[in-house]
């Protein structure tokens, strides 16, 4: 699928009334990280950004948020790293406008061909976006290229048993892996070391499905979407 076509279709997904009922004007579009203290989906989304940000050094100077969505996550990263240049990246011009409208920096670029200088970033973040990249492996290689030695890749990602359930256009065929260890091997193949992942499905995907069920009338659809995911993971890796 052409990048412009994908971006337009994904904009429509984000703008869907059911999704707006879930997220409102929060600027988020992720499943969140839930705990006993979580008040609502928006606070869960804040917590997920914090989880992805946790491995990044407080002294980071440049942080790239690749696939930045509507910008709430980029803005939160900028608040966490006030001395860093935090930049969102996206293909969608509408999403870029929304991100900039929230006071965050953002640039138009393809995750598989980042328009960023080599050895220029301290951290690359992909929060629920790498599954869509064409391809995820190309993104891993690009993240390796743009990171400085010692830089960190931090992702929140989903692996699917059946990606067609959410729409065959949303997950390119090369990204359709279901095994967590295989995902790690793809990261290592790009050159990364200190690769560490953890399955956090019970505190991300599972409670999100509960929230989703409140706005979807067809619970069969919700159950199919719920069972399509094999792992919701958090991963960190280091560019040697």
Model-derived segments and spans:
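A short glycine-rich, Lys/Arg-flanked "PGG" loop and its adjoining helix->strand segment in the class I
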Residues: 137-152
């Amino acid at each position: 699928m052409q990048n412009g076509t994908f971006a337009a279709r994904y904009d429509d997904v984000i703008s869907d009334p059911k999704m707006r009922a879930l997220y409102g004007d929060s600027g988020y579009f992720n499943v969140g990280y839930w705990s006993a203290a979580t008040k609502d989906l928006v606070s869960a989304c804040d917590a997920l950004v914090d989880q992805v940000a946790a491995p990044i050094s407080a002294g980071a100077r440049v942080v790239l948020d690749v696939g930045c969505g509507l910008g709430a996550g980029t803005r939160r990263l900028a608040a966490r790293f006030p001395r860093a240049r935090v930049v969102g990246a996206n293909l969608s011009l509408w999403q870029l406008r929304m991100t900039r409208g929230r006071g965050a920096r953002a640039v138009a670029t393809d995750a598989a061909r980042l328009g960023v200088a080599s050895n220029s970033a301290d951290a690359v973040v992909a929060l629920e976006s790498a599954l869509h990249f064409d391809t995820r492996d190309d993104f891993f290689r690009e993240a390796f290229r743009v990171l400085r030695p010692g830089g960190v890749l931090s992702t929140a990602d989903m692996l699917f048993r059946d990606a067609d359930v959410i729409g065959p256009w949303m997950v390119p065929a090369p990204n359709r892996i279901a095994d967590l260890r295989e995902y790690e091997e793809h990261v290592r193949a790009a050159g990364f070391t200190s690769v560490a992942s953890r399955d956090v499905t019970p505190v991300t995907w599972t409670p999100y499905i509960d929230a989703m069920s409140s706005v979807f009338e067809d619970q069969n659809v919700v159950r199919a979407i719920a069972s399509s995911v094999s792992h919701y993971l958090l991963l960190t890796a280091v560019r040697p």
